[in-house]
Amino acid sequence: TIYMAGGEPFLIKENLKIIELIKKENPDLLLRINTNLSNLTPKIYNQLKTLKKVHWIVSAESTEARFNYIRWPGEYSVLQKNLKLIKQLPHKITINMTWNILCAFNILDFIDDMIQNGLHPNQFVMNYVSDPIFQSISNLSENLRKDLISKIEQKKKNINNKFYLYKVYEE
C-alpha cells in the first residue's frame, strides 16, 4: 500500500511519477489518496483510472458557500465535478469529514447532497474536531446544541438503520 497525502497530493509533482511507477511496476498495488479533489487534472485522472486498486479519501464536510469558505480556495462546484469523475471508476471512495463549529449544521445537508448524488451512506467518516477548542461544536450555545440534536434525531428517523460505518477503510 502507498498512501498519498498532503496538503493536496496532486500539487506534489513527484506523485505523478509515483503513479506512473505503480502503473508500470505493480498495477495491483493499493494506492490510498487523501485529497480535497481540488486539483484533479486530466493527466492525473487518466493515470489513476488505469489502476485497479485506488482508495480515494476525500476531505469535505459542507456545501456551496460554506464549503468555499472552510476549504478555501476550494470550490464546491469543482468538488462535485471531480467526485462525479471518480465515481465512474471502479475505485473505493470514502468521504472524510471534520465536524466543526463552521459546519455544525451544514454537515447534515452535505451528507444529504452526497447521497442524492450517488454516494452510499456507508461512505462517510465523521471526525469530531476538539482541538483547536475554538473550532469545536461544544462552543455552540445550549439552544443551538438542542436544535442540532433535534435535527440529528430527525435525520436518524429517515435513515435505514442497516447502514452503519463498518470497515469503511478496509479494502
What are these regions, as identified by a protein language model?
Residues 1-13, 25-42, 49-80, 92-101, ...:
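Core AdoMet radical
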Residues 22-23, 46-53, 87, 115-118:
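Acidic (Asp/Glu)-rich catalytic clusters
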Residues 101-117:
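Catalytic cores of alpha/beta
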